[in-house]
Amino acid sequence: MPLDVHQRLRILSDILRSHQLDCCGTVSEYEQAGRLAQTLLNESGFQEDIRNTFSSIQQYTEKGARHNNPEQYILENHTHLDEWVQELDQLTPYDQ
């Protein structure tokens, strides 16, 4: 059963939040986040600013999957991770 847009947004947010909080990420997490960002980019109906966010996330995941020092890479991108998680959570707020 394919994931709907909200499920993909939630999973992408969860992966980025995990990177942000744990300061580590696996190659498979980067690859999964990159695939999610790409499929979301292919969706119609998103405004240009969030499409730019998906592109930035995709670039982050491509570089992160190849980076020699994952912890340092995440620390260098901590501000971006904060912004991306907030943006994604605004699109799909967690149930309270």
Question: What is the role of each PLM region?
Answer:
Residues 3, 7, 28, 45-48, ...:
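Alpha-helix boundary/N-cap detector
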